[in-house]
UniProtKB/Swiss-Prot annotation:
This is Probable calcium-binding protein CML48. PROSITE patterns: EF_HAND_1, EF_HAND_2. Residues 52-87, 121-156 form the EF-hand domain. Potential calcium sensor. GO terms for molecular function: calcium ion binding. It comes from Arabidopsis thaliana.
Length: 228
């Protein structure tokens, strides 16, 4: 039985530079972890993962699962991602990821091995998109770069919507708004997820859909009300 969460947006398509690495024989994980050299590992957790799972995924999961429950809760997921090179992920984004990738039949916000693998692989693809549009390698993405990234994700936003999104990350200092990877991941997951949910009700891609109030609320609320 599949337990894929209905709210998880599809992973973004990889940049051509990333795909070329695969064609050249490089591991897809080297894009996110260029310094990591896989070695044979023997772990009590290995049996929880499929044989082809990258050892780094198993290692980070095992190291973060402090209570040995076989699941990662909020603080444990933050540690696992930090061990995997994703430092600085905010509480909001951690909770968003937990909600999106958790087992739907589980009432708790936590990830098992299968869900963690799905998240881990998806994050590498989001990181690849971020790196592609962070052209000056500043670790930040400006408004124009964000617009281009959304376009690449298949989300052509009206200017008013784009400006509203950018304004959510304005710190009030009057400086130009730049988004770090964490902020890009948060807004990207929400925009892409909501776009895909809308398109389920707009199969002709007309840009219009007829929704009942209940359907609208069920579509939007899970993306915006779970994380503070």
């Amino acid at each position: 039985m599949s337990y894929s969460n209905a709210y998880a947006p599809s992973a973004p398509e990889l940049p051509e530079s990333f795909v070329q690495q695969q064609h050249d024989g490089e591991s897809r994980y080297t894009y996110a972890y260029p310094s990591y050299q896989p070695t044979q590992q023997f772990s009590s957790y290995s049996g929880m993962f499929s044989p082809e799972t990258h050892p780094e995924i198993v290692r980070s999961f095992e190291s973060a699962d402090r209570n040995r429950s076989g699941f990662l809760e909020e603080s444990e997921l933050r540690q696992a991602l930090s061990l995997s090179g994703y430092d600085g992920i905010s509480n909001r984004t951690i909770r968003l990821l937990l909600f999106i990738y958790k087992i739907p039949v589980d009432s708790l916000l936590r990830l098992g091995p299968k869900e963690y693998v799905e998240l881990w692989n998806c994050l590498a693809q989001w990181r690849a998109i971020f790196n592609r549009y962070d052209r000056d390698r500043s670790g930040k993405m400006n408004s124009t770069q964000l617009r281009d990234a959304f376009y690449n994700l298949g989300c052509v936003l009206p200017t008013s919507v784009h400006q509203l999104i950018v304004s959510q990350f304005d710190d009030g200092t009057g400086k130009t708004v730049d988004l770090c990877f964490d902020s890009f991941l948060e807004c990207g997951m929400i925009v892409k997820g909501l776009t895909e949910k809308f398109r389920e009700n707009d199969p002709g891609y007309t840009g219009y859909a007829t929704l009942s109030y209940d359907v609208f609320m069920l579509m939007v609320i899970p993306f915006i009300a779970t994380y503070d």
